[in-house]
Structures are given as C-alpha cells and as structure tokens.
Amino acid sequence: MKICCCLITLLLVPSCSKVSPDQSRGTSFSIKRGTNIAHWLSQSTRRGEERAAFFTQKDITFIDSVGFDHIRLPIDEVQMWDENGNRNADAFQLLGQALTWCSDAGLRVVLDLHILRSHYFNADEKPLWTKPGEQDKFIQLWKDLSAAVREWPASMLAYEIMNEPVADDPEQWNQLLARATDSIRTWEPERVIVIGSNRFQSASTFDQLRVPENDKNILLSFHFYEPFHLTHYQASWTRLRDFAGEVNYPGQIVVNGTTPDEQRVYNIDSLEKMMEKPIRVAKRLGLPLYCGEFGVIMKAPLEDKLAWYGDMVAIFEKNGIAYANWNYKAGSFGIVDASLNPDVAMVDTLTPE
C-alpha cells in the first residue's frame, strides 16, 4: 500500500490543504480516487452503538493513508429523517462527525442521497415519478440537508442529488433534476452538484441526460458494473445467484459459454468503448467526469478481479476520470473487512503510484 496525494482538478483551482467549516467557500472540488462508505448511513439496519462503531475516525485515517483523496458517502432518507421530515439526531450527528474527520484528514466528500422512501432503484413501485407530492418532499429533503451541512466549503463537500434514478421516461428524471438543481442554486450557487443519467446512471444512457446549462459547478457521474457475470458473480440478489460457470477476464467472459451474453469478449478496449457516451458528453460540455461506483464482488476469482480493476483504473487515468470503488468495508464488495484488515492487492490496484 502507498500514499498518493496526486489530484485531478475537477473544477477550478485544486487544493491539497485541509479545510474547515469557517474557511471561505471556493468553487474548486478536486478529487481523483476514492471509495464508497456503503452500509453505514445507507442500506443498513444498524442503529445506535452498532451503527456508530461501524465507521469511525480510524477508517478515515486508513482511507487517507493508502492514497484515497475522497469518500462517497451514501445516505438514506429512512436513516436521516422520519416520515414527517424530522431529522434523526443521531444520524445527523454521525454525518457531521464524518465530515469533520474528513476535513481534518484533508479528504473531500461526495454526499449522496442514495435511497428515498419514494424511490429505490430496484423497487417495482417508485412513487417519486407518479405522485407530485413526493417530488415536493424530495426538494424539501435537500433544503433541509443543505441547511445542515452548507457550512462546509464547496472545495471540500459536493452534493449528489440522487443515486441511480430509474424512471420510465428519462424526461421525468431530467425535469426533476432541473428543479432540484435550480432549488439548490438558490441556497448554494457555488456548491458542486453531482448528476448522472436515468436508468442506474449507466454509461449507455448518458446521452439522454439533460445537463443544466451555464453551470460549471456540475460533476457528471456514471456507474459501471460490466461485465455483469464477473462483477456480480453468484450475487445472491441477482439472476446469477445459481450460476455455476467459470468466468474469465480479459477474454470471453464465461468459459464454455453457450449464449451470446456468455460468449461476449471483454478487455480494456471494450470497457473503454462502453464509456464513450459519458466521456464524449463531458468533453463536449467542458465538465469533469466521475465514475462514482464500480466494483467486483469479493467472491469472484481473484486474478480476474484484479485484472478488471487494473484495466478500469488505467481507463480512468487515461481519460481524466475521477473514481470511487464500490465499496470500502465488508459487505459483498468490501476492500477491507470489519476489523480493517485490507485486501492489499486490491487497495494497491486502486491506488497506483
């Protein structure tokens, strides 16, 4: 493992200095490589002391020491607010604590509103798109969240409006995105806002994203989990739960595959080609690009997994794309276990010198 402070400037002037809430806000948000703090304030039933103990300052110290420069921090509505929109004091205290730790370590934060009561990307019913009142509530959540954390400078903290929107029509997301962005701009004109396209922030749908005009404080984001046979190898929540074949990367993804999907060949060139849409949009608009999620399940074959991660990082570095792997600790995709024992090969691959 190693320490690396090299940054790709995502907006205006880069800064490696530590920041604190009372510093004047800038419009720079400089990141290169980070990790997702999943299953803490999002997608978790942990509460009380168990939740508080899951992610601590020791984690931030480790993240900084191995060369990451930021975290992406998913939060869920159900953890942060009750059904009437009242804040959960414990959850907001943990959030504030994490921001302080990151500031003290010189780390940046992408604060991601991950799951709403009205929108979970894998759910069949998503009232966010069918009930206007839910969209009003969504805007109110951002107003309250902004009020809670806006003291942190724009050079240290960015807002990701919503994780992996899934609407029947991409215009439903584009319209809500425009409304949310306009609202946030009335409170925080210089805050960096992270946005992605409809249908899971997929690279393949990026040309359907309507990006706010004349706003340079935008960070474009996509997620990448291809080839699925490798990244979600035998994942219990997917169609591959009972898959018994042998996966292979680079090359034909399933050894002795019998379907076109299983016989498809993946390598660094094919992966980069799949990212063409977001790369092209970012270049055309002169905006920075971020892969906010990518990863391979822990149970996948190690050699293939490391080869994939190595190729992904090479593509990101070639194209000036910042990135955050999914995810940091435990779960199905972690790069460290619950006792902070790292997968050294994985960490080194994600943080090359």
Model-derived features: where do they sit?
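Sec-dependent signal peptide recognition
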Residues: 1-7
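Active-site mouth of glycoside hydrolases
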Residues: 25-192, 197-207, 217, 332, ...
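C-terminal motif of bacterial Sec signal peptides marking the signal peptidase cleavage site
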Residues: 14-15
